[in-house]
């Protein structure tokens, strides 16, 4: 069964085409549409076993972008399917499912209405995610669609961990609580990591660290999310590329009063101008921070130390919550590729039973590999995440 997986952003569409069977999957193509709504848009199409294809032209909206993707998939030279009739279902990544969606589901009018109702608490992501669904309805009418939510895996978090100590009326009226994100990735790498380490996913204590430009740490107890570092929005928790992470709210209101900043301006400052970018005024990319660190830049040294320390802090917190830990997993763009970060975070965790193996860690990038010594009580691994495969799998299981 050929499944199209879409991840629609405000000005981009990431996609993969995967041929799914009960016990196997085969990637046929992947690509990205960028600069939607700008004067010059881009399509980069990468079919497996064929030459990549690029297109540069105005792409006014998501519907136009998806049409270009479908044209590329059936192109005689660069395509991977003979006809669009081969596409049996489309799976969508949706950032926020609120309390409505504890698992993936087939798209209905009710599902679309609930995604729309969450626009105000996920204004950067949900509108674009829904636009992808509506665009497919226009260009592939009748094809079944499935939504897979970043928040679903975290719906198992108990109230003691998801509630904020605010007046309860705000939860009743607005559902203000911790939701958590990156759930699709956390669940996938925990399952793969448990298998790699010979652990029972449903009878284990796993801490997953999804570290990229955005990042979160999750405590997984007996196969279910028990706590996670992101909160009501993806702003909370770790120091990130441009996001501040955990901070005293009074510091923000103080800055707002002193600078005469609106709520919108404060929100932009915390989400777009903070993190390692704000600390260094150099970059939001940890590779640039690493170079500045090596050159002795004091602000880069502070930023990287804070970045690593916050990850370690959540690992310690979640080990305490679960009464110990059996495995720590690193994933995401930084988690999969930064040997320095993994070693720095694990150094000092010997008291928890972590015995890190620097030799195994060296050069381990984008692979699934155990990074702890054979006699380490706590297993450590890097696992390459594959959210698109999870979306395709959920889609296949719901529509087959």
Regions found by a protein language model. Give the residues of each.
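Internal helix-turn-beta structural module
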Residues: 301, 305-321, 326-329, 335-400
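Glycine-rich beta-strand-to-loop/alpha-helix junction loops that act as flexible
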Residues: 9, 92-96, 211, 325, ...
